[in-house]
Amino acid sequence: MSENQTADEGRFSSTEIRILGALIEKQATSPESYPLTLNALVLACNQKTSREPVMNLTQGQVGQALRALESQDMTRLQMGSRADRWEQRVDKALELVPAQLILMGLMFLRGPQTLNELLTRSNRLHDFDDTEQIQHQLERLISRGLALHLPRQAGQREDRYTHALGDPAEIEQILAARQQEGGARSSGGNVSEERIEALEARIAALEARLAELEG
């Protein structure tokens, strides 16, 4: 898929999405043990931390999903004398730069997230300077149909972003909720949201001032 192509094809199951996210993460955080054996990949998929939702996949489920992903050039099996290992090919298949690959991996593992959450959770994976850098890369992914921008809903303070490579029915639900939320905003007032934004801006300014004084 080139930079100008979109993700009209190649939707993946929740198991396949979890596998891709786990491979991307372990490539960045555990290069000494990457590519992963099937057993190591199952453990990575079923981690109880940094996973939303937590899953309980079997070796059979992961193995079957890996073969399906391999047929779409999203994973590759490396045969070894001691053990076979699997690697991700998402960056090559979708022609992603490293920053985009990490963001896709985070969204594969944890679903919709705010810019600040992506910045915090990527600190061991990629060196983003700020949320503006993340937003720039997300906008490029959105333009190619690989990610979605989700306006904040009631009770939320920030917009969220998620990948667009999952089950089409789930994506349709997200888009429908997004459209409904947008309609509600255009017909109603945003006084409370504007006040929250003003308070957040004031807090950010105070934090920046405090950092200057401490420096």
Curated annotation (Swiss-Prot):
InterPro entries: DUF480, WH-like_DNA-bd_sf, WH_DNA-bd_sf. It comes from the Bacteria. Gene3D superfamilies: Winged helix-like DNA-binding domain superfamily/Winged helix DNA-binding domain (1.10.10.10). PANTHER family: UPF0502 PROTEIN YCEH (PTHR38768:SF1). Belongs to the UPF0502 family. This is UPF0502 protein PputW619_3184. It comes from Pseudomonas putida (strain W619).
